[in-house]
Amino acid sequence: MTVPSAEELDSFKYSDLQNLAKRLGLRANMKADKLLKALKAHLNPETRKENKNQDENQFSTDETEIHVSSEEQAETESGGHVTKTRRRRRKKHKTIHGIPTSQTLLQDHLEMKGTDSSNFQNQENQENQDPRDTAEVPSLPEQRPEDGNAASSGEGEVNDIKDSKKPLEKRSLCTDEFSKLGNNKRTSATTPNFKKLHEARFKKMESIDEYIMRKKKHLKEHSSLNELKLDKKGIVTPVPPRGRLSVPCTPARQQCPQGHSATKMNVRFSAATKDNEHKCSLTKTPARKSPHVTAPGSASKGQAVFRTPKSKATERTSIAVITPFKLMTEATQTPSSSKKPVFDLKASLSRPLNYKPHKGKLKPWGQAKENNSLNERVSRVTFHRKTYKQPHLQTREERWKRQEQERKEKKEKLLEARRNLGVTKAQ
């Protein structure tokens, strides 16, 4: 790889300079001027030394500038401090002769350091003491009398610094006290006595014995009502209404229900399910005796067995009696169970006709059409010759006639298709 000279580098393009920097292992993502300088410095060691000297000179000039600016800031601060002290001394009827020297400033700085350390020790002692004692401490320096006439200029400056620091000390002490008190309160209120809380909750709750007693009482009250209902149902016989016959006595012909509704039918499921006997509600219709006959051996001692002696008359009538359930089953027969009736030709011919049959000649089916294509063509030509200057406009009546004819043709085609006449004609 040939190393290009400085003149050749100046003639290079930016892309060539970047490629060269990448080959040499330098950073290529820079501006053109900086990249050219970096390449020259890398290739020529003399230029590198010159760049180093330039950097050192720049650094020294920067340091001198920083030093000068810091001195100027210090002078401005010292001037500001003097003006403040002058104002304070005017208020206290004091005068300052001359500008403070560097020695006096150093003494003030040392005194301030001493006061800071003493203040820090006092703060530690106050923290160890009680908060009441610490609250009383900052009020002591306020009670001291000011010795303005006997104090010198240096002492006055120190006193001013101390006076300016007093409110800061008070604030810090007060904030520490309040923070300590707040922390103590929080820690004391965070842990409640759970034992007392649980005891109060358990006292409010009802005991198990009380709950059982209340439940038993409630059941007794309701069971007595149910027993009364059962007694009434067992002893009292229902009185049939005057205007109507009872349901089991009606013959099959008189009973013609148009539609059986569940509300009108008196259905009792308690016979089938004895466990629901105590849940009977007060119905509008009187309760019927259950047809379920119990055996004399199976009947319990407490229950009375009701039996009706069956006579011959009742046996005869029982055949004619049809209950609503039987009616329902007879009326609703499934199509799968019922067999399809076989067509009997003799029986159908013997029956009288329910319509009047047609007598006489029948009209021919489908009119015989002649080949009138030639005649139609001649008539059409003559018609156009007559009306070539005034063309014939289609009227509504003609349109209606055409539509009516189309409808008739459509109807005939449908009838032919239904009666399979089109197939026979084709054959």
UniProtKB/Swiss-Prot annotation:
The record's account of how the chain is modified after translation: Ubiquitinated. Ubiquitination by FZR1 may lead to proteasome-dependent degradation of this protein.
Region (Interaction with microtubules): 243-367
Pfam families found in the cross-reference section: NUSAP
Stretches assigned to coiled coil: 393-425
Residues carrying Phosphothreonine: T191, T250, T323, T334
KEN box (motif): residue ranges: 369-375
Residue stretches of biased makeup (Basic residues): 83-96
Biased composition (Basic and acidic residues): 43-55, 159-179, 394-419
Bias (Low complexity) ranges: 119-128
A cellular component term, taken from the record's GO annotations: nucleolus
Compositional bias of kind Polar residues: 181-190, 252-264
Region (Disordered) location: 41-190, 235-312, 354-427
Compartmental location: Cytoplasm; Nucleus, Nucleolus; Cytoplasm, Cytoskeleton, Spindle; Chromosome
Domain remark from Swiss-Prot or TrEMBL: The KEN box is required for the FZR1-dependent degradation of this protein subsequent to ubiquitination.
Subunit composition and interactions: Interacts with DNA and microtubules. Microtubule bundling is inhibited by IPO7, KPNA2 and KPNB1 while association with DNA is also inhibited by IPO7 and KPNA2.
Family affiliation: Belongs to the NUSAP family.
Name the record gives this protein: Nucleolar and spindle-associated protein 1
Biological source species: Mus musculus
